[in-house]
């Protein structure tokens, strides 16, 4: 999917990816917010695309993320750039479901990060504010 989009862009003389495309393999995890849930019994490949900002990057990134997020059960890497996609908070709530609720409950009960120093604005909106309306 990513390679196809890169090749299509090149045919139109657009080069949104100007550094690397890396892969990372993950096994299943019981961590509540891991991108590979514990019920998955296969190795999962995550793709990371690194690019210096250029005139074609934003459109490429948004198009690719929309395609990836359309895959049932897909879970984006928490540290990547997808915060501006419409409906992303709802998507995250859906795919993480009960795990997200459990994470928030434990976070509150154990008083983890009471000053929210480990939250960026997107995570603060998603985890603390009304997550359904965050970034819709």
Name the predicted role of every residue range.
Residues 1-59:
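C-terminal substrate-recognition/cap domain of FAD-linked oxidoreductases
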Residues 2-5, 64-68:
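Short amphipathic C-terminal alpha-helix that caps PH/PH-like domains
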